[in-house]
Each structure stands twice: as C-alpha cells, then as structure tokens.
A protein has these predicted regions:
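Intrinsically disordered, low-complexity terminal tails/loops enriched in metal-binding residues
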Residues: 1-51
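Feature targets compositionally biased, intrinsically disordered low-complexity regions
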Residues: 24-26, 38, 56, 66, ...
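Histidine- and aromatic-enriched segments that form or immediately flank copper-ligand environments
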Residues: 42-158
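Extracellular interdomain linker/stem segments of modular secreted and single-pass surface proteins
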Residues: 159-163
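Acidic-aromatic/histidine active-site loop/patch
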Residues: 171-178
Length: 178
C-alpha cells in the first residue's frame, strides 16, 4: 500500500502525463499501420524534438518518434510485408536499426555501412518481410550516444510468443532495456 502522502501527488502526475502537455501522447502504444494496395503494412515514424515533462515542472527536450518516449510499439504478423517510413525532422541525421528481427542487410540501419544517414528533412523507407515470432526493438544508430538516451527507441513485435500451458496472460506490457 502506497503511503497516502505519496499517492495523491503521484496520481496527479500520472494523470498529467497521460492527459497533459508532456509529450504528444503516451509512449509504447500500438501504432496502427496504413495498409497499402499490395497488402504492405506501412508504419510512419517522424523523428522530432519534443518538450517532455519528466517530473513535475521539469521539462527537457526529448528526441522522439511520433512525439512520444518511448516511440510507438509496432506489431505485425510473421509473413507480413512491412514498410517503416522514417521522416527525419531532427536537427541532424538519423537512421533506424532493428534488434531481435531478421531484416535484409540493406535495411539494417547502420549509417554509412548498410545505408546512408537520413539527413534532416529527408525520408527513408525500410522494407522487409516479418519473420517470427519475435520480440524486438528499434532505435537510432546514428549519433546513438545521445539520440537513444534522449528517446529514439521503441518496441517491435512479430506475432505472439508462445505462452506455457496453464499460464494465463492478463496484460502484455513491452519493456525496452536499452
């Protein structure tokens, strides 16, 4: 049981995070794809700097995907054709690198090795067929020493991981340790 003196301010801050002007929304939420005519599931990610209230009254500049930290959760099924369109609105170049997923080398997001960095104001499309099931993540690999700790990361799920017999899942909450 949380001490009553802590509960009220904590509840108020959580309400402000979910309802207030923190980032452009709550992070880690499922991102709905746009289904293309050929069946490809397209996910649009805008990399941008956003004000983020990390504690009451303390606002920092977060580097975000679609205005949230962490970025949206992407979930697809094995065999899905996937397109991730990165729109770079940051003041420097960036890329998206995937962990825990099997993607073609040209789509692996390693700047100047597998692809050129995505310059400010430019877009790049990552395209691959999802293999899985897999629990993975995506994050920047360009200037990662500050872009990732500043917020450029998100969960990427392919299918559903098998659950042991007799175990009931009440809620799935992706957690990213980065």
């Amino acid at each position: 049981q949380m001490d009553a003196t802590m509960k009220a301010p904590t509840d108020a801050f959580v309400k402000q995070l979910t309802d207030g002007p923190n980032t452009k929304g709550v992070g880690n939420q499922l991102l709905a794809p746009t289904i293309q005519p050929d069946g490809t599931k397209q996910f649009d990610l805008k990399a941008e700097v956003t004000d983020w209230e990390i504690e009451p009254g303390k606002i920092v500049k977060a580097w975000t995907y679609n205005g949230t930290v962490p970025g949206p959760t992407i979930k697809v099924q094995p065999g899905d054709k996937v397109r991730i369109v990165l729109d770079n609105q940051l003041p420097e170049s960036t890329v998206i690198h995937f962990h825990g997923l099997t993607v073609p080398n040209a789509m692996d997001g390693v700047p100047d090795i597998t692809q050129p960095p995505v310059r400010p104001g430019k877009k790049f499309s990552y395209e691959f067929v999802a293999q899985g099931p897999a629990v993975g993540m995506y994050h920047s690999h360009d200037f990662a020493e500050h872009q990732v700790p500043d917020g450029l990361l998100g969960a990427f799920l392919v299918g559903d991981e098998p659950v042991p017999a007799g175990v009931a899942v009440s809620q799935e909450i992706p957690m990213i340790l980065n």
